[in-house]
Amino acid sequence: MMKKAYVYFCFVLAFIVVGCDDGATNPIEVKVQEETVLTRDDIKEDVVKDARDGETYRTVKIGNQWWMAENLRYAADSSLCYNDEEYFCKAYGRLYPWIIAMNLDTTYRRNGAIYADVIEPSHQGVCPKGWHVPTKTEWETMIEFVKAHNGTEGDGTSLRSPEMWAESGEGTSKVTHSDRFGFSVLPAGRHTDPMAGYDGNIYTGFTSYAYFWTSTEVNSYRNDVTKAYDVRVCGHWNDRAVQLENDKSKREAMSIRCVKN
């Protein structure tokens, strides 16, 4: 059922310095004059089949965008399973280094390369035909819609699946997971940059964080193009738990959610 409430507000996806802050973030400002509070019953759902491997994915319409409501499981070369265990790929989807997620030719697979000339506005990457790796702007659009239509509920609460998240630890005693929009974020964690000085094959964040690559590169004033934007969902907070990051190396492996062309 849909109910309407007229609220004037401004949400700012702020820089969190405790608990959910482990990297550089950019604020996502949302200005809404009229809010329509949506429930799960208002969200359209469908299913898409990946013709390459026969995998099927639940999809949801959030605003004007159709999103996969599950992490991609396509077994691209050099994609990973958390802790190198196949179970995690089946339950949480695969983890992809940015270059692999973008499905770029080996000619371009070199550290420091700028890929703007080979990345399409709707870049398919490892997604099935008719779908693509979302841009930074497409993620921002979705997050803005969620924050404009979830009432007083936090963005983390609205997007997280009620399954698999840690039930103990800093801040988690008051954390809720409504999955209001059916997006069903799972705490799949990530694989760290093997060239960043970490000791060994390090997977991190499982049960507490989800990380999703965008197709948008970070091109700073220092011309640092070894990084790309990602979206991190933290399990320790209800509000301001969804953050856009710009400090992760393209060598790190993260989850992929595809968006429809």
Protein language model annotation of sequence segments:
Residues 6-14:
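Sec-dependent N-terminal signal peptides
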Residues 16-19:
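C-terminal motif of bacterial Sec signal peptides marking the signal peptidase cleavage site
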